[in-house]
Swiss-Prot record:
The protein's name in its UniProt record: DNA-directed RNA polymerase subunit beta
InterPro entries in the cross-refs: DNA-dir_RNA_pol_bsu_ext_1_sf, DNA-dir_RNA_pol_su2, DNA-dir_RNAP_su2_dom, DNA-dir_RNAP_su2_hyb_sf, RNA_pol_bsu_bac, RNA_pol_bsu_CS, RNA_pol_bsu_protrusion, RNA_pol_Rpb2_2
Broadest EC class assigned to this enzyme: transferase
Gene3D superfamilies: 2.40.50.100, 2.40.50.150, 3.90.1100.10, DNA-directed RNA polymerase, beta subunit, external 1 domain, DNA-directed RNA polymerase, subunit 2, domain 6, RNA polymerase alpha subunit dimerisation domain, RNA polymerase Rpb2, domain 2
Keywords: Chloroplast, DNA-directed RNA polymerase, Nucleotidyltransferase, Plastid, Transcription, Transferase
NCBIfam families: PRK00405.1
Family annotation (Pfam families): RNA_pol_Rpb2_1, RNA_pol_Rpb2_2, RNA_pol_Rpb2_3, RNA_pol_Rpb2_6, RNA_pol_Rpb2_7
Gene: rpoB
The species this protein was found in: Pinus thunbergii (Japanese black pine)
PROSITE patterns to which the protein is assigned, alphabetical: RNA_POL_BETA
Length: 1075
């Protein structure tokens, strides 16, 4: 998207660019770097040498298409080949060969991966950058301050330096154990003279090393061996004497210094910059000079000569992108490969072997499979709509390995920091436990080389006042100490820029300052927000909490049967649709030769270019992905022109809902508490009808009794359930499936003994002498809510890692879901609600021209939620619909003048009333409101009502997937009460509050039924079914239910005996019985 301003033009970056850049960095740099670090391997006798030449690696072209990998449940990958050399020194024989190391999953054009047929995305992680950070905290008495310096390694491990109240310096090796700094420095190889020669504050250092008023020089003159022994005792909490040995020294080096003191290149750079050191960046481990400089700085902080760090500032954070995560896994795989080659090379001395024989290719494949299958940052891609895919790839997570958890993260970490300005969206985050821990990148932010977040600004020249765009890092001098004007205060009009004051950001504070003192300015009002928030028109009129809900609920909107683009938008809809990859684009200029539903063939300079369309493809969230051609045969197209629209695009613009006529008024209580009543027009005209594609799968395994069989001949099953199967036992294409119908007929072999275990098997064998079947039916049936049309059946046959033949059958069923009571709908401003009733259109309130409204919303949902943007949105929708106009409005239009949004809306309503000759569209007495007529009585409502065309979406929270009922089902073994949940065919548990509600109505018999024979009274529960069939009286329980018996047993386990008594109805005498 290109936006022109007075000073120039700029282009909004591609939304998926961050994922693409990260993966390209891994392929171009990460692979070569790790292969270059792969060591030379020799056997014990040094007769054979093995080496890889990583600079010449090759990635083969994938042998399978991405779409075929999805259908066949395969991984979309490329094969990695690396030249290798083995040398036999005895025979002086040199063998060179290009060896196959394994498979590397490839990123597709959407910035995602296909692993085992499932789309997955790798989420960027935001972590504390490795280095040292100084803070002050109160002691346990909350009186004095303790100054600490925390050294954070590249893997997130922490070591802490601290000055206590007694002014001693300690290094904390664990939560409970600490060691004095002289012992640590002595263990690292320094003596007291070297310490005092290299410190900036020798006097202060000696003063802080005092103990009880006297010098203990022998403590500071400890030998290295003695210091290592003392360090080892403190680290492992060992009492008693130890004997120094090299193995003890190596263990300390491996367990402590290698794990907690590995800084990495980024940590080394941060440490050099913080402590003013000049150590090469390839020195990735902490040195004694680092500890000494850190102690010096800590002393300076103690006496006011240093500055404390803000750990939440983005300059102290880094982004671990997909490149870093994949490179770590590749490093892990090469480490396993090194161990495997060392084991193999021992046996290779006795026989002839090639370099390929020394290498096993399964290690790399298994490592990446484990990463994509189980790593917290490799997530199941949310494909509800294209916006969801874009937003998922742009997430930033504080969670994951080396990060925080939802339970331990503080409020300060979750809060918005001023350094997020232009880099992380202050609105878009998760709701619930992860609020503030999963954020989203701003649309202009990009990730730098060191994992830092950058944001663009226009730099204003002091002399000529000309501007040019620069990217600022968080914490840079320009970002901290220069004044940056905010985008919501700038006008495109040059005259308004010369105003005296403007809001600006300076040193993490927001101030008001003269325009002449501004150094930088924002390039666009949208640059602080994420993609989802940037699609909300009139955003500035909404409370941030409701904007957050609106942004999240746009990602839950399902694709509709006939999508429609919004009348009032922000202008980013086209960019979002383009970058999502849901539309087909012409790659070159040419002429359309042939077009159908599947292929678009164009002629480009005499060559034929074929573009495949996506036809009724299932997404991860069971929504329908589909493309519709938008060009005609013989038409000439240009490069970049849209060839086919997606399921949620119209004319290349993202279209997640429908423009419907809404009225803000109460209606007989049916819109109480955000409920929504709708017209039957939305049902019968398929306004909110959506298609969903569900996949059911069944595996054909090899059992101990033989292979399972797919067949139509299923004994003891009603022929009606098998009516859709073909001769192979698979459901036929185009069949209409109801709940319980067999989709795939399967027989599992079993022994005769297993067959005779069933009662019917023994009965048939005894009475009739019939041979019992040696196979049991194990068919795939349509579950509850699985009705629909079969659109595809795929029988997948592949060989697994163990060499066995694995067969799977996938059945795809298309479901057409109309909107109904219980479905959830939402606008873009957090105005959500559940459908409470579907009214006949003649009963709906109607306009003065006789058009009935489509939805009635509760007006009380606007003032308390402070999302007035929905009112500003629906009024231009009302004006633009008859004039066939669409509005694209950037937020913060108040920068032009006060009440700019109102001054935009009312003139448009006036124009619409003039052009349509309907004066009621704009009534000066109450602009924006209209007189509505009750459809039931024909009377005019007493008060004028706000009506308009609002853009409402149907969300994925649909009643078909949530509602559940059962007449019979399983019970819990212990309590004998119904199980919980739809997936287990559970029932309703009558709990405490339900009992209170029934007691309030005095329904004693219903309450007794609910608590006994319908719940956990076993004997009566079994007798009820027979009583219902025979028409006899319902039996009454005369003993305690099972839950009460369970309570008695639990009390008995606590040595408490509880007896109960039953009073006779005849003589009111107590009849005691054992429970």
């Amino acid at each position: 998207m290109r936006l022109d301003e007075n000073e120039g033009a700029f282009t909004i970056p591609e939304f998926g660019k961050i994922q693409f850049e990260g993966f390209c960095r891994f392929i171009d740099q990460g692979l070569m770097e790790e292969l270059h670090n792969f060591p030379k391997i020799e056997d014990i006798d040094k007769e054979i040498e093995f080496r890889l030449f990583g600079n010449e690696y090759e990635l083969a072209e994938p042998f399978i298409k991405e779409r075929d990998a999805v259908y066949q449940s395969l991984t979309y990958y490329s094969e990695l080949y690396v030249p290798a050399r083995s040398i036999r020194r005895n025979s002086r024989k040199i063998q060179k060969q290009t060896v196959f190391l394994g498979n590397i999953p490839l990123m597709n054009s959407h910035g995602t991966f296909v692993v085992n047929g499932i789309y997955r995305v790798v989420v960027n992680q935001i972590l504390i950058s490795p280095g040292i950070y100084y803070r002050s905290e109160l002691d346990h008495n909350r009186i004095n301050y303790i100054y600490t310096g925390t050294l954070i390694s590249d893997w997130g491990r922490r070591s802490k330096l601290e000055i206590d109240v007694g002014e001693r310096i300690w290094a904390r090796v664990s939560r409970k154990q600490k060691i004095s700094i002289p012992v640590l420095l002595s263990a690292m190889g320094l003596n007291l003279e070297e310490i005092l020669d290299n410190t900036r504050y020798p006097e202060r250092f000696l003063f802080l090393l005092k103990k009880k008023g006297r010098w203990e020089r022998e403590e500071y003159l400890w030998s290295r061996e003695k210091a290592i022994l003392e360090f080892y005792k403190k680290l492992y909490c060992i009492s008693g004497d130890l004997v120094f040995s090299e193995s003890l020294c190596k263990e300390l080096q491996k367990k402590f210094f290698r794990k907690r003191c590995e800084l990495g290149k980024i940590g080394r750079r941060n440490l050099n910059q913080k402590l003013n050191l000049d150590i090469p960046e390839n020195e990735i481990f902490s040195l004694p000079q680092d500890v000494l400089a850190a102690v010096d700085y800590l002393i300076g902080v103690k006496f006011g000569m240093g500055t404390l760090d803000d750990i939440d500032h983005l300059r102290n954070r880094r982004i671990r992108s997909v490149a870093d995560l994949l490179q770590n896994q590749f490093r892990l795989a090469l480490g396993r490969l090194e161990d495997a080659v060392k084991r193999t090379i021992r046996r290779a001395t006795k026989r002839r072997s090639t370099p390929q024989n020394l290498v096993t290719s399964t290690l790399l494949k298994n490592t990446f499979q484990d990463f994509f299958g189980s790593h917290p940052l490799s997530q199941f891609l949310d494909q509800t709509n294209p916006l969801t895919e874009i937003a998922h790839g742009r997430k930033l997570s504080h969670l994951g390995p080396g990060g925080l958890t939802g339970r331990t993260a503080s409020f300060r970490t979750r809060d918005i920091h001023p350094s997020y300005y232009g880099r992380i969206c202050p609105i878009d985050t998760s709701e619930g436990m992860n609020a503030g821990l999963v954020a989203s990148l701003s649309i202009h932010a990009k990730i730098g080389d060191c994992g830092s977040l950058q944001s663009p600004f226009y730099k204003i020249s002091e002399r000529s006042r000309e501007e040019h765009m620069v990217y600022l890092l968080p914490g840079e001098d320009e970002d901290e100490y220069y004044r940056i004007a905010t985008g919501n205060s700038l006008a495109l009009n040059q005259g308004i820029q010369e105003e005296q004051i403007t809001p600006a950001r300076y040193r993490q504070e927001f101030i008001v300052i003269a325009w002449e003192q501004i150094h930088f300015r924002s390039i666009f009002p949208f640059q602080y927000f994420s993609v989802g928030v940037s699609l909300i028109p009139f955003l500035e009129h909404n409370d941030a909490n409701r904007a957050l809900m609106g942004s999240n609920m746009q990602r839950q909107a399902v694709p509709l049967f006939r999508p429609e683009k919004c009348i009032a938008g922000t202008g980013l809809e086209g960019q979002a649709a383009l970058d999502s990859g849901s539309v087909a684009i012409a790659t070159q200029e040419g002429r359309i030769e042939y077009i159908d539903a599947v292929n678009i063939t164009s002629s480009v300079n005499g060559d034929t270019v074929r573009t495949e369309s996506v036809i009724y493809q299932r997404s991860n969230t069971n929504t329908c992905t589909h493309q519709k051609p938008q060009i005609h045969q013989g038409e000439c197209v240009k490069k970049g022109q849209i060839l086919a629209d997606g399921a949620t695009t119209v004319g290349g613009e993202l279209s997640l809902g429908k423009n419907v006529l809404v009225a803000y008024m109460p209606w007989e209580g049916y819109n109480f508490e955000d409920a929504i009543l709708i017209s039957e027009r939305l049902v019968y005209e398929d306004i909110y009808t959506s298609f969903h594609i569900v996949r059911y799968r069944i595996e054909i395994c090899m059992t101990s009794q033989g292979p399972e069989r797919i067949t139509r001949e299923i004994p003891h099953l009603d022929a009606h359930l098998l009516r859709h199967l073909d001769e192979n036992g698979l459901v036929m294409l185009g069949s209409w499936i109801e709940t319980g119908d067999v989709l795939v007929g399967k027989l599992t072999p079993q022994t005769i003994e297993e067959s005779l275990c069933t009662p019917e098997g023994r009965l048939l064998q005894t009475i009739f002498g019939i041979e019992v079947s040696t196979a049991r039916e194990n068919c795939l049936r349509a579950p509850i809510g699985g009705r629909g049309r079969v659109i595809d059946v795929r029988w997948i046959n592949r060989v697994d890692d163990s060499g066995d033949n694995a067969e799977t059958v996938h059945v795809y069923i298309s479901q057409k879901r109309k909107i109904q009571v219980g479905d959830k709908v939402s606008g873009r401003h957090g105005n959500k609600g559940i459908i409470s009733i579907v009214l006949p259109r003649q009963d709906m309130p109607y306009l003065q021209n006789g058009i009935p409204v489509d939805m009635v919303l509760n007006p009380l949902g606007v003032p308390s939620r402070m999302n007035v943007g929905q009112i500003f949105e629906c009024l231009p929708g009302l004006a633009g619909n008859p004039m066939n106009k669409h509005y694209r409005i950037t937020p913060f239009d108040e920068k032009y003048e006060r009440e700019a949004s109102r001054k935009l809306v009312f003139p448009e309503l006036y124009k619409a009333s003039e052009q349509t000759a309907n004066p009621w569209v704009f009534e000066p007495d109450h602009p924006g409101k209209h007189r509505l007529i009750d459809g039931r009585t024909g009377d005019v409502f007493e008060q004028p009502v706000t009506i308009g065309k609002a853009y409402m979406s149907k969300l994925s929270h649909q009643v078909d997937e949530k509602i559940h009922a059962r007449s019979s089902g399983p019970y819990a073994r212990v309590t004998q009460q119904p199980l919980r949940g739809k997936s287990k065919r559970g029932g309703q548990r009558i709990g405490e509050m339900e009992v209170w509600a029934l007691e309030g109505f005095g329904v004693a018999y219903i309450l007794q039924e609910m608590l006994t024979l319908k719940s956990d009274h076993i004997r009566t529960r079994n007798e009820v079914l027979g009583a219902i069939i025979t028409g006899g009286p319902i039996p009454k329980p005369d003993t305690a239910p099972e839950s009460f018996r369970l309570l008695i047993r639990e009390l008995r386990s606590l040595a408490l005996e509880l007896n109960h008594a039953i009073i006779s109805e005849k003589n009111f005498q107590i009849d005691r019985e054992e429970v």
